[in-house]
Amino acid sequence: MAAAAQSRVVRVLSMSRSAITAIATSVCHGPPCRQLHHALMPHGKGGRSSVSGIVATVFGATGFLGRYVVNHLGRMGSQVIIPYRCDKYDIMHLRPMGDLGQLLFLEWDARDKDSIRRVVQHSNVVINLIGRDWETKNFDFEDVFVKIPQAIAQLSKEAGVEKFIHVSHLNANIKSSSRYLRNKAVGEKVVRDAFPEAIIVKPSDIFGREDRFLNSFASMHRFGPIPLGSLGWKTVKQPVYVVDVSKGIVNAVKDPDANGKSFAFVGPSRYLLFHLVKYIFAVAHRLFLPFPLPLFAYRWVARVFEISPFEPWITRDKVERMHITDMKLPHLPGLEDLGIQATPLELKAIEVLRRHRTYRWLSAEIEDVKPAKTVNI
């Protein structure tokens, strides 16, 4: 009888949320002291209706990479907090990615620390995917890649966040000719200073259905001949698939040994820019007519697009990034170290480029397209 009564008491305590909270509070010594809640206690067999124990705040979730990260987190039963600044209709596509109550949408102000603190205070994981391809009068590259990530990292550290993941770029370099890449490098440093255990992800150019990489090159057919600096013979690219990057980020969240490391996410093959763009046009069944355009002239053309009131198709900084060879960083761990086999460009290019075809070739397969020529430099 005594044993049975004792087992009943134990079962009652184990199901009592108030008791769990009291125990968690009593054993927490020193700031920051965070209460244990149901979303942090894993249960279920896996899948969207389970609870993974991860409560993740994903900054930049409304962007290209963000939708894939949110989907992978939701698929494993994580609770995802999504800060947003856009119209509510622009986040509707994210709602089906998690079970009922698992996706929480909160408006935030990137320059308001109280707003940032509010969206990270209940999370044990914070992922920063905030990015911008061009500068605006409201946010320049220093704001987007340095000041905002620094504030998020500092406030996440103060809130007791266990894992912080910051997405930078493979070619981030303080000496780069690109202002974008220089600020990416500074952003890595300030994040590491504010959150020493941060995981820094350095992907190369990312391709996928909604990208500004393959789609950008493919859309050049509207202008006729394709301008490339030095015809693309001096630039080497190693693009990586967006799903691989997303899986790598989620696996880094689950890997206890990833803290404090930097990861280089790249595709399996390197291509000369000339061969890469030629392959893009072959898959899109478009006529490839390249011509060499000096970079100073390319920048002048880009300046015309910058002063347009519409979204710029090209900017001077993008011209610089387009013609920078992707770094080789063999000393850094990569996708393979997180259990992911990088996807070849040739397997997924058709998903991105089919929409650039004319109606005649819309349903054609890609067996007749020769794979892009790779290089080892």
Curated annotation (Swiss-Prot):
Acetylated on lysine residues. BLOC1S1 is required for acetylation. Acetylated by CLOCK in a circadian manner. Its main location: mitochondrion. The modification N6-acetyllysine is found at residues 189, 370. One of its GO terms (biological process) is aerobic respiration. The modification N6-succinyllysine is found at residue 175. Residues 1-35 form a transit peptide. One of its GO terms (molecular function) is NADH dehydrogenase (ubiquinone) activity. Transmembrane segments: none annotated. It holds the Pfam family Epimerase. It comes from the Eukaryota. Its cofactor is FAD. It is found in: Mitochondrion matrix. One of its GO terms (cellular component) is nucleus. Keywords: Acetylation, Disease variant, Electron transport, FAD, Flavoprotein, Mitochondrion, Primary mitochondrial disease, Respiratory chain, Transit peptide, Transport. Binds 1 FAD per subunit. It is linked to Mitochondrial complex I deficiency, nuclear type 26: A form of mitochondrial complex I deficiency, the most common biochemical signature of mitochondrial disorders, a group of highly heterogeneous conditions characterized by defective oxidative phosphorylation, which collectively affects 1 in 5-10000 live births. Clinical disorders have variable severity, ranging from lethal neonatal disease to adult-onset neurodegenerative disorders. Complex I is composed of 45 different subunits. This a component of the hydrophobic protein fraction. Interacts with BLOC1S1. Interacts with SLC2A4. Interacts with CLOCK. Interacts with RAB5IF. Accessory subunit of the mitochondrial membrane respiratory chain NADH dehydrogenase (Complex I), that is believed not to be involved in catalysis. Required for proper complex I assembly. Complex I functions in the transfer of electrons from NADH to the respiratory chain. The immediate electron acceptor for the enzyme is believed to be ubiquinone. Belongs to the complex I NDUFA9 subunit family. This is NADH dehydrogenase [ubiquinone] 1 alpha subcomplex subunit 9, mitochondrial. It comes from Homo sapiens (Human). The lineage of its organism: Eukaryota, Metazoa, Chordata, Craniata, Vertebrata.
